[in-house]
C-alpha cells in the first residue's frame, strides 16, 4: 500500500513539474521573448538595442544568482538611471518568477 502511495505521489509531482515548465515557457513567450529572444539568446532587434545578454553563455549565467534574477524580474532593471527592463512584480506571482528563473537557467549550454 505504501508503495502505491509513493508511486502516485511521484507521478503527481512529476506532472506538476511538467506543468510548471510549460507555464514558464508561456510566461517567457508573452513577457520576455521580445527582448531576450524565444531561445534566450537576446538576438532580437530590441535585445541588440539594449545589449541583452545571451543566456546560453555559462559565464553570463554564472554572473548572477537566482535571487538577483528574481529581483530584476520583480523590480525591473535600470542602466544609468534609464529603465532597460520593466518590472513584472505586479504582473507575475513569486511562483511564476521562480519558474522563469529556472527556465532561464535551462538555456545554459
Predicted regions and their residues:
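Electrostatic cytochrome c docking/interface patches
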Residues: 13-29, 43, 58, 63
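Short sequence/structural segments immediately N-terminal
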Residues: 23-30, 80, 107-109
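Post-cleavage N-terminal segment of exported redox proteins
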Residues: 1-22, 103-109
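Axial heme c-ligation environment in periplasmic c-type cytochrome domains
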Residues: 45-58, 72-107
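The canonical Cys-X-X-Cys-His
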Residues: 30-38, 100
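Acidic/histidine-rich alpha-helical segments that form the ligand environment
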Residues: 69
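Detector for the c-type heme attachment site
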Residues: 35-44, 106
Amino acid at each position: 500500500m505504501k508503495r502505491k502511495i509513493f508511486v502516485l505521489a511521484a507521478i503527481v509531482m512529476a506532472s506538476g513539474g511538467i506543468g510548471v515548465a510549460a507555464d514558464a515557457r508561456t510566461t517567457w513567450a508573452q513577457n520576455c521573448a521580445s527582448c531576450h529572444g524565444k531561445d534566450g539568446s537576446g538576438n532580437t532587434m530590441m535585445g541588440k538595442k539594449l545589449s541583452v545578454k545571451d543566456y546560453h553563455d555559462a559565464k553570463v549565467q554564472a554572473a548572477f544568482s537566482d535571487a538577483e534574477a528574481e529581483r530584476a524580474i520583480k523590480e525591473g532593471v535600470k542602466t544609468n538611471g534609464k529603465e532597460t527592463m520593466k518590472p513584472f512584480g505586479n504582473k507575475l506571482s513569486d511562483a511564476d518568477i521562480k519558474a522563469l528563473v529556472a527556465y532561464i537557467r535551462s538555456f545554459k549550454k
